[in-house]
Design a protein with these regions (language model features):
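Extracellular jelly-roll beta-sandwich "head" domains, especially the C-terminal globular C1q domain
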Residues: 4-117
């Protein structure tokens, strides 16, 4: 997130959209919940970042949940606690929480930051 914070900080007066997000998913492996959707206007490219608290049923193996921004994903061995991820994209960009186990439930609470670059 340090790199993302530095980039956003250098954008100066740019309008950074900040959206609080929260979601929980349970069920089979592969189940997911969309935390936020960003519609990037045609001809524009945006930086989208997510920062927040990941709470997974498992956090020490390949069963830990993942955060996605578009096709960019958080490492599958992410630990519970504060995590961050950034993506540069166009078109429709979804921020999702995806399960990798069928046991328990996974949740995420944080913020999505989006800005035209």
């Amino acid at each position: 997130m340090a790199i993302t914070s530095e980039i956003i900080g250098k954008l100066g007066g740019a309008d950074v959209e900040v959206t609080p997000v929260s979601g929980t998913t349970s069920g089979s492996s592969g189940s997911e919940v969309i935390l936020h959707t960003i519609e990037v206007p045609v001809g524009e490219t945006w930086l989208v970042a997510v920062y927040g608290n990941l709470n997974g049923a498992y956090s020490d193996n390949y069963s830990s949940p993942q955060i996605y921004i578009g096709d960019t994903k958080l490492h599958q061995r992410a630990t519970n606690g504060i995590n961050s991820l950034a993506h540069i994209g166009t078109g429709t960009i979804e921020v999702k929480l995806r399960r990798n186990t069928g046991n328990g439930s996974d949740s995420f609470t944080g913020h999505v930051y989006a800005v035209k670059i």
